[in-house]
Design a protein with these regions (language model features):
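Glycine-rich, small/acidic residue-mixed loop/short-helix segments
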Residues: 73-79, 83-157
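Contiguous alpha-helical scaffold segments within structured protein domains
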Residues: 1-85, 156
Length: 157
């Protein structure tokens, strides 16, 4: 995955955007090297971004400024979100929010790019694929199938 140009580009879009949005809100921000996070049914490229917020910045300001990331909202943000609202026929609901915790001394969040909702005896699964210049439609559909199957695998385990 780390050698795949498309995966590297997707990851770079996200972490570069987050760092840009931290500017003005954080005293410092450090990005880790990309790593593979192996899970039972799928693997991810993972980077940690550790930031020390300015005293006048609260966690909610940070979250509002960062989300949605390009992983789920596209880039450039305003134009991409307008296009998503035009094209998608459904509400995204809980898909793609920040997942984590806030405490007095430290907070930690992740970009939640897959989610599921069990309601009224029905399971709704949400996932997406990064569409970039040069993306192959068949490969993107396969990626969606793989992601959904990994979620179903967790459900059945």
């Amino acid at each position: 995955m780390l050698q795949d140009g498309k995966n590297r580009m997707e990851n770079r879009f996200v972490h570069t955007d987050i760092l840009t949005r931290l500017d003005g809100l954080a005293e410092t921000a450090v990005v880790s090297e990309a790593q593979i996070l192996p899970l039972k049914h799928i693997q991810h490229i993972k980077r940690e971004i550790e930031a020390t917020l300015k005293t006048e910045t609260c966690d909610w300001q940070l979250l509002k400024n960062i989300h949605p990331t390009p992983a789920v909202g596209g880039s450039p943000r305003r134009k991409a979100l307008a296009q998503i609202r035009t094209l998608e026929q459904h509400q995204r609901g809980w898909y793609a929010g920040a997942c984590g915790f806030i405490s007095e001394d430290v907070s930690e969040f992740t970009v939640a790019i897959r989610s599921g909702l069990w309601h009224d005896q029905q399971l709704e699964l949400y996932t997406g694929a990064g569409i970039l210049t040069g993306s192959d439609a068949d490969e993107e559909w396969q990626e969606l199938d793989t992601k959904l199957n990994s979620m179903l695998g967790v459900w059945h385990d």
